[in-house]
Amino acid sequence: GVNIVLNLFFGTAVNAARGVGVSVFSAVSGFINNFIFAMNPQLVKYYAVQNYEAMQQLIVKGTKYAFFLLLLLALPIVIETDFVLTLWLKTPPPLAATFCRLILIAALVETLSTLPLYGILASGRIKRYVLVMSSLFICIPLLSYVGYKWCNKPVTFCVYAEMASYVLALGLRPWLARCAF
C-alpha cells in the first residue's frame, strides 16, 4: 500500500529507493526471524504445561538477544550505508541510503515486539490480536496518503507512519498478550 502511495506522489525513483531499503531489511531480518522462530517450540511447550513464568522469561531473554543480534548486523550497515549500496548497486537511487537506515532502525523497534507475538500465538487466542493489528497496519497507507498531501517530503512522513505503527504495535502486543493468558 505504501509503495502505491509513494509512486502516486513521488514517482518511481523514490519507490525504487524504498524498495532497496526493503530488500536490505529482508536480508537482515530473515536471519533474525530464523533465530526467533527457533524459540517458538519452547514457548508453545511452556504454554502447554502452563509454565507462564518460564515463558515470559524466555520472551524477555529472547527479545534481548534478538535485538542485540539485529543491532550487531544492522549497525555496520547503518553507519556505512552509502558504501554498502555502492558495492551492491554501483549507482544506488537517490534516497536509498536514507530509506535503508530508517527501515533498519524501524526493524530494531519491531524486533522488540516479535517474541510477544509468538507468546500470543502459543496461546491460540489470536482473534483479538489479528483484528487489532490488521486494523492498525491497514491504516498505514491511508495515513501515508494524508501525510503526503500535507508534507511533500517522501522520507519524512514515511518515517512517522512506520515508527508510529511500530510504537503502537509495541504497546499493543503486551496488552494483547495479557488478554490471551
Where do the protein language model's features map onto the residues?
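Interfacial/gating helices of multi-pass transporter permease domains
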Residues: 5-26, 54, 94-98, 155
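Helix-loop interface residues and adjacent transmembrane-helix termini in multi-pass membrane transporters
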Residues: 9-12, 122-124, 150-152
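Residue-level recognition of pore/gate-forming positions within transmembrane alpha-helices
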Residues: 23-26, 61, 74, 83, ...
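Interfacial transmembrane-helix starts/ends
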Residues: 19, 51-80, 97-100
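Helix-loop junctions and terminal segments of transmembrane helices
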Residues: 21, 25, 29-63, 117-122
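Membrane-interface helix-loop junctions in multi-pass transport and translocation proteins
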Residues: 127, 134-181
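Interfacial segments at transmembrane-helix termini and the short loops linking adjacent helices
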Residues: 12-13, 60, 77-108, 152, ...
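Membrane-interface junctions at transmembrane-helix termini in multi-pass inner-membrane proteins
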Residues: 104-135, 177-181
